[in-house]
Amino acid sequence: MDLLGILSPNAYFCSMAKLINLKIFTHFFRSSAAGGILLLICVLVSLIVANTGLGVHFNDFLGYPLGFEAAGLQLRYPILLWINDGLMAVFFLLVGLEIKREVIEGELSSLRHAALPVLAAVGGVIIPALIYFLFNGQSPDTAKGWGIPMATDIAFALGILSLLGDKVPSGLKIFLAALAIVDDLIAILVIAVFYSSELHFLYLGYAGGIFVLLMVFNRLGVKNLFFYLLPGAVMWYFIHHSGIHATIAGVLTALTLPTNQEDKDSPLEKLEHALARPVNFIIMPVFALANTNIAFESEMLQGLTGNLGLGIILGLVLGKPIGIFVMSWLSVKIRAADLPAQTTWTHVLGLGLLGGIGFTMSIFIALLSFQEQAYQNEAKFAILTASVLAGAAGFILLSSYNKNKQEQ
């Protein structure tokens, strides 16, 4: 080995540069804002691709079938379906794990702790849906999109909140995370009940049998994840063919995984830890990349003032913060809950605005709501517009409020 080569200035600075770059890279992916930033990059890339000559090739790629068919087993689907039904099932598996953990030992484990995020989430679901229905209730083509403004993109919302650092109380971040989990739970129920197609009870029976088997494994104390994930994948196949959206399989699988407060190395905790980074840094960015590819047309700006666009934008930008704020205020007023420490009503209003960042979850429900490409694109554009407006308003309100407090 050439010792002089190792000690030379060039070699030293090159090795230091690599080390610094590695530290920057590691620090970025450990930050709470990383998921939101990566999502934003994927959105921009997807929009650029869609509005260049690459858009046609990208759509052809998403439509390319992958998989196989054998002995009556149908597992050959377009890449886009694998993303929206397959990868998103893994996302909902993680959501299910988070919900179960919070109910057993987290912010939702007691009525007093759960009251504020639960009631706030309910308000943040009902008011946006009512606003949307006010504009679209009489239209048979767009009325079914009422679930679109109900959703919150937790990665973006927490990402923006984390950019404020210690300018906002830590309790506000916990409040937003708990609220988003309840929001996701409501979205799951809405998808299962209202966005299912014609039901095939034979496949539902098969899926139900596997769910019972997983519950038996839980009761027997089986801790090997293989005995939950493999049957869970089979349950996904049956649910996909049953008429209920296949992502529900992820939630059902999560509910059967064993956990308890004493065992920090339980199957639920292990799987939740293992899935967090792949979901945040692979699955959600891939979903955004595949589903935000909107080719802009002049008619889209006009669509923002149509019933569909107004229902989504006003539902997210106004309905979300109004619903979250009013229900939070009522829950504190009737002494059912308390605000987190050092949290003011201005903080709650800012949090409500961040809850209006529907983005990936709203797009997901829009794809379930509309089969027509024109409605899908109009809804996506309205969701993007609303998410930018709500996110910017929430960030400006919270940062300026903190600045004013410091000056006082």
Curated annotation (Swiss-Prot):
Organism: Flavobacterium johnsoniae (strain ATCC 17061 / DSM 2064 / JCM 8514 / BCRC 14874 / CCUG 350202 / NBRC 14942 / NCIMB 11054 / UW101)
Transmembrane regions: 36-56, 79-99, 115-135, 145-165, 174-194, 197-217, 225-245, 281-301, 310-330, 348-368, 381-401
Protein name in UniProt: Na(+)/H(+) antiporter NhaA 2
GO MF terms held by the record: sodium:proton antiporter activity
Predominant localisation class: membrane
InterPro entries: Na/H_antiporter_dom_sf, NhaA
A GO BP annotation: regulation of pH
Metal-binding is among the record's keywords: no
Membrane topology reported for the UniProt record: Multi-pass membrane protein
